Swiss-Prot record:
Pfam family, one: DUF179
Family under the similarity heading: Belongs to the UPF0301 (AlgH) family.
Signal peptide from the UniProt entry: none
GO CC annotation terms, alphabetical: cytosol
Upper lineage: Bacteria, Pseudomonadati, Pseudomonadota, Gammaproteobacteria, Enterobacterales
Protein name as catalogued: UPF0301 protein SG2023
Residue ranges that the Swiss-Prot or TrEMBL entry lists as coiled coil: none
HAMAP family (alphabetical): UPF0301
InterPro entries reported for this sequence: AlgH-like
């Protein structure tokens, strides 16, 4: 089972405050573990514009029509002082990895330098930190019914209102997340 480019959808029973009602976009999943970004937990009153200002990134060719008041997300509890940028594919960034034909992750500053300009990727999600699972941990959590999984959807990742992402991700499975039980039967 490879869950790269999938969403993890927290079951209603998952009460860990870091992951309660979370949707995690899985960037990498292999025999060593998994890495993902929470896509529906914004950092309170912290925007992409704040990040650029704090890093003193002020592109000369800034396009005022491009909004930078988008939220920055709490991607997870690990390396929460580092930025992780999910975006639609675009060449030319120093530390980019293709996750799927529709999505890349970049950790280098050069992607931030394009934000607010005509050179920025079409869709961008900026997060601080990431979520990680060591070898076998995510698989155990799945067996314990902590998460649902579904293939990722770019519309949910980049365009669905933040407060609706948990519910909408579950809807891709044909379920109402509020009406499911957290216990699975075993025959």
């Amino acid at each position: 089972m490879n869950l790269q480019h999938h969403f993890l959808i927290a079951m209603p029973s998952l009460q860990d405050p870091l992951f309660k009602r979370s949707v995690v976009y899985i960037c990498e999943h292999n025999s060593d573990g998994a890495m993902g970004i929470v896509i529906n937990k914004p950092v309170e009153q912290f925007t992409v514009e704040n990040v650029l200002h704090k890093l003193k990134i002020m592109p000369a060719d800034r396009d005022p029509a491009i909004r930078l008041d988008k939220p920055v997300f709490a991607g997870g509890p690990l390396a929460d002082d580092r930025g992780f940028i999910l975006h639609t594919p675009r060449d030319g960034f120093g530390s980019s990895i293709g996750i799927s034909p529709q999505t890349m992750i970049t950790t280098s500053k050069d992607v931030l330098e394009t934000l607010g300009t005509a050179d920025q990727p079409d869709d961008v999600l900026v997060a601080l930190g990431y979520s990680g699972w060591e070898q076998g941990k995510l698989e155990r959590e799945l067996m314990e019914n902590a998460w649902l999984t579904t293939p990722a959807d770019s519309e949910i990742l980049f365009h669905t209102p933040i407060a609706s992402r948990w519910r909408e991700a579950a809807k891709t499975l044909g379920i109402d997340i509020h009406n499911i039980a957290n216990q699975a039967g075993h025959a």
